[in-house]
């Protein structure tokens, strides 16, 4: 699950760079949404991993 979160975070960052750089102005809102979803998924997976007591697989 953490792997998916990292993947979506990277996609959101790339989309954000393209959108905020003026290359694709329409992707700004999509990048914001994907970025915040990735942050939420990362936080949830980190908390679940801490509660289970296992080390995260990075």
From Swiss-Prot:
Domain of life of the native organism: Bacteria
Subcellular location: Cell membrane
Pfam families: DUF1328
Sequence intervals crossing the membrane: 4-24, 30-50
Alphabetical UniProt keywords: Cell membrane, Membrane, Transmembrane, Transmembrane helix
Family classification: Belongs to the UPF0391 family.
NCBIfam families linked: PRK13682.1-3 (NF010228), PRK13682.1-4 (NF010229)
Protein name (database record): UPF0391 membrane protein OCAR_5266/OCA5_c27040
GO cellular component term, pick one: plasma membrane
Naturally occurring in which organism (per UniProt): Afipia carboxidovorans (strain ATCC 49405 / DSM 1227 / KCTC 32145 / OM5)
Membrane topology of the entry: Multi-pass membrane protein
Keyword Cell membrane attributed: yes
Keyword Transmembrane helix carried by entry: yes
């Amino acid at each position: 699950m953490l792997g998916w979160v990292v993947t979506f975070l990277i996609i959101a960052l790339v989309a954000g760079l393209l959108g905020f750089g003026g290359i694709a102005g329409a992707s700004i809102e999509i990048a914001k949404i994907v970025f915040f979803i990735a942050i939420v998924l990362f936080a949830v997976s980190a908390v679940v991993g801490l509660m289970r007591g296992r080390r995260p697989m990075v």
